[in-house]
Amino acid sequence: MEVVRYFTRNQKQLPATGPNDSIVQLPDIPPCYECNVEVALRFDSSLDSEKLQQSLKQLLEIGNWRQLGGRVRRRDTNPSACNYDLHVPAEFTTERPAFNYQIWELSGAIDEHPTASKMPRPTDPKKVSFYNVGDARSPLRTRTRYPRKAQEWADSDLPPLSFEQLSFRDGTIILLVFPHILMDATGYGLFLKAWTSVLQGRIDHVPQCCGFSESTTDMLGHKTPAGAFTWHNHLLKGLDSLKFTAGLLWENRWGKEDRVIRVPAKFIMHTRDKVLADLSTSQPSPFVSQSDVLIAWFTRVVLAALKPLQRRTLVLTNAFDTRHMLPPERAYLQNSVCMAHTMLPVGEVLYNPVSFLANEIRRSLVRERTEEQIQARCAWAKDVGIMPLLGTSDMLLCNVSNWSKGNLVDLDLCHAAVTEHRGPCVPSSILNCSQMGGVTPNYGIILGKDSQDCWWMQWHLPKFCWAGIERELDTINQIRWE
């Protein structure tokens, strides 16, 4: 009911703070984090909603995990500031619960439902699969009207963790919703892992949770000066920033759409073997990961379909986790990612083989994941802004976020299965339903690897380029690469 009350009351009336609420100051965040993260998971088993809710309640009474039930509040009345707090109730009650959980009972089969049936499912593991998911995303994310931005959460008294369960005769869809100011994908993955530990009766496996008031970047220290940051002289500002914004507006004029691509394990292994063979002619012990190859291969496919001027600069940003720098005994849920930048002329990327871009992506990650570079980046960002824009005024910006470390594909809810379940009960489909809003650059999400080691990706690109991408994928499927 709190969801309904939020959208029917006077928006200018701010919610009262509970007299015994504990106030937790969230680290400052850039404006791009003020959106929601909304993810739909399909399970091919009926799940017991009571077991799922009881295990959630149990988790959110353990130590700092309770902070996930806090209410978002704006710390600064300045509307341009991105400073928020969590007001954590001393006790979670029916009126102020630790989380919101909506249940929709549907009597039919999951594949008979007009929306659920359109979520991407594994098909031929030997072919690159292509899914148009526009019709599947909208109905899932609009069934309940949650706040969409951090300020809307601050105007409500809703708990930031929200779940919607669509229960069918033979399956379940769970929509996970949370404000991005709280966590990144890896942090949410740590939360889900703790949840399943409680669900399985293994409370002793739940790690200590780091409080949200502790900034992971501050934990790393600031011993390295800002000038040591690799890209410190590539800040986009002034007229160059205006030119880039105008160009981005122009490129968004036709609108953008999402597609999901499933890439066979053997294709990536074959491509990686070829990349390593190419690199071995100039390097003694070359290394690139499967995700390096995946991003490099598909970025070249995207560039070929977009047909940008070859003199433009491709700026490929690749999100990486900084938790490897922190003590391992605690779970760090808060946003803890930085962006590795690869800047190359478009023509150079298209002229050279996949190995060229894959190697540059790996070099960027190796260079920017060091403790010194992360410290320098944080010091530099404090000088020029929390998340400054790097690149050139004519750049083609492409952002990539790798959710594979969040392990969404491994979320095992077998202990909540209504009927006896042999083996794990993991998602058969994952769909990002988040709404970025406004003008956005091109971006892709690596959703993870499934049980057949096939990679799943979801990309947000201009509508006009998808036909060319689909033709290229069809061509690839005609080639014998096993």
From Swiss-Prot:
Keywords: Acyltransferase, Transferase. Disulfide bonds: none annotated. O-acyltransferase; part of the gene cluster B that mediates the biosynthesis of the fungal meroterpenoid acetoxydehydroaustin. The first step of the pathway is the synthesis of 3,5-dimethylorsellinic acid by the polyketide synthase ausA. 3,5-dimethylorsellinic acid is then prenylated by the polyprenyl transferase ausN. Further epoxidation by the FAD-dependent monooxygenase ausM and cyclization by the probable terpene cyclase ausL lead to the formation of protoaustinoid A. The lineage of its organism: Eukaryota, Fungi, Dikarya, Ascomycota, Pezizomycotina. The keyword Cytoplasm does not apply. Monomer. Belongs to the plant acyltransferase family. GO terms for biological process: terpenoid biosynthetic process. The keyword Kinase does not apply. One of its GO terms (molecular function) is acyltransferase activity. InterPro entries: CAT-like_dom_sf, Sec_Metabolite_Acyltrans. It comes from the Eukaryota. Pathway: Secondary metabolite biosynthesis; terpenoid biosynthesis. The active site is at H180, D412. This is O-acyltransferase ausP. In A.calidoustus, the austinoid gene cluster lies on a contiguous DNA region, while clusters from E.nidulans and P.brasilianum are split in their respective genomes. Genetic rearrangements provoked variability among the clusters and E.nidulans produces the least number of austionoid derivatives with the end products austinol and dehydroaustinol, while P.brasilianum can produce until acetoxydehydroaustin, and A.calidoustus produces the highest number of identified derivatives. Its EC number is 2.3.1.-.
